[in-house]
């Protein structure tokens, strides 16, 4: 297939950084046909671990491979020219493959169709390849994928068998294996070195539990983990030390938009039994796992007492200020009265001076 031919253009040597956990390099490519609206749109996004670092969009005013992380901006003009050329060439091949698949599935040109491809590699703490990926999907369904042995293919329907036979005829698996074991790993090490401070950090989650009434006798407890990196995290609920995996609602880890991630897990519990349930949070950024319970707010009586004390205290302060103001004003008025009385007395009248005849 023409789709895979351009992976081998990613050859480069790189310095292998010291690392303590697995890392991954992934490229996600998508082509969407738009009948009556011109050529299919083609998009590439590249990720190192959970961080997007490059993007290409054929609908941009000037389609180019663009940086999406500060650290990749260290690459020079040659890098961006080369990546842009490869992206544009890959886009042309995707459009050809879209037309080919229309024939395989006996589909018409007046419907929109989607072709997706993910490829990349994982490396372990020792810097060696853990696993390589090369997977293709058509209209949201698995189409063909390279097996974990990197030597054979899995086709998911009759149409994809055609692509499998073509790939086997030219030993496409050998080409993919060469890329995944070599250049893919080398590029990943290079990116880890360039983005070391960002990519190899561990931001611990900030966690708390919220309380949501569900019915007269049930409530939902939701355990939140916010602001963590990397994305790998485990949230569990326990009742008296036993995990509630089957009774727990768990959402997928979501990007927060600031380079960190968020996730929550929820359980429905009987009203009044909330304190028997604990949430446990596991993340590499934590020195030890977190254990949380729902903390009810202070009782209404306590709140009323506090409010009453504050009201009385405020009244005392205001009253004291008023009394002080009145006393000060009275002293001030008394001084002015004595002065006026003295000026008005006869001893200070001009008649005490010698009068003219």
Swiss-Prot record:
Positions of the region Alpha-1? 21-110
Per the UniProt entry, the signal peptide is 1-20
Give the sites modified to Phosphoserine.
347
Q: Where is this region: Connecting peptide?
A: 295-304
Q: Known SMART domains for this protein?
A: IGc1
Instruction: Give the start-end ranges of region Alpha-3.
Output: 203-294
Topological domain (Extracellular) residues are 21-304
Q: Where in the cell is it found?
A: Membrane
**Which UniProt keywords are listed?**
Disulfide bond, Glycoprotein, Immunity, Membrane, MHC I, Phosphoprotein, Signal, Transmembrane, Transmembrane helix
Q: Does the keyword Glycoprotein apply?
A: yes
Membrane topology listed for this record:
Single-pass type I membrane protein
Q: Assembly and partners?
A: Heterodimer of an alpha chain and a beta chain (beta-2-microglobulin).
Protein name, per record:
H-2 class I histocompatibility antigen, D-37 alpha chain
The encoding gene: H2-T23
């Amino acid at each position: 297939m023409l789709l895979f031919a351009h992976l081998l253009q990613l050859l480069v040597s790189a310095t292998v950084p010291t690392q303590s956990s697995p890392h991954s390099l992934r490229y996600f490519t998508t082509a969407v046909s738009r009948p009556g609206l011109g050529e299919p749109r083609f998009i590439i996004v590249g990720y190192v671990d959970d961080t997007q670092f490059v993007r290409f969009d054929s609908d941009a005013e000037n389609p180019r491979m663009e940086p999406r992380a500060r650290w990749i901006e260290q690459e020079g003009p040659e890098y961006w020219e080369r990546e842009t050329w490869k992206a544009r060439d890959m886009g042309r091949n995707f459009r050809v493959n879209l037309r080919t698949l229309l024939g395989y599935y006996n589909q018409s040109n007046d419907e929109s169709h989607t072709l997706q491809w993910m490829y990349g590699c994982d490396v372990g703490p020792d810097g060696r390849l853990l696993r390589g990926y090369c997977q293709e999907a058509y209209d949201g369904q698995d189409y063909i994928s390279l097996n974990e042995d990197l030597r054979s293919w899995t086709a998911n329907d009759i149409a994809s068998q055609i692509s499998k036979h073509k790939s086997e005829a030219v030993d496409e698996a050998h080409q993919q294996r060469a890329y995944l074991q070599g250049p893919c790993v080398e590029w990943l090490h290079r990116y880890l070195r360039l983005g070391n401070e960002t990519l190899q950090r561990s931001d611990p989650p900030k966690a708390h539990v919220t309380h949501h009434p569900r019915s007269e006798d049930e409530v939902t407890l939701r355990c939140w983990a916010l602001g963590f990196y990397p994305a790998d995290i485990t949230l569990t609920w326990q009742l008296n030390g036993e995990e509630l995996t089957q009774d727990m609602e768990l959402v997928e880890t979501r990007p927060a938009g600031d380079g960190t991630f968020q996730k929550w897990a929820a359980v429905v519990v009987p009203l009044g039994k909330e304190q028997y349930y604990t949430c446990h949070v596991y993340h590499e950024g934590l020195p030890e796992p977190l254990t949380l319970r729902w903390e009810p707010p202070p009782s209404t009586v306590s709140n009323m007492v506090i409010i009453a004390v504050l009201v009385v205290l405020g009244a005392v302060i205001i009253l004291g200020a008023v009394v002080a103001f009145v006393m000060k004003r009275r002293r001030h008025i008394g001084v002015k009265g004595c002065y006026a009385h003295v000026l008005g007395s006869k001893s200070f009248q001009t008649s005490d001076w010698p009068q003219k005849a």
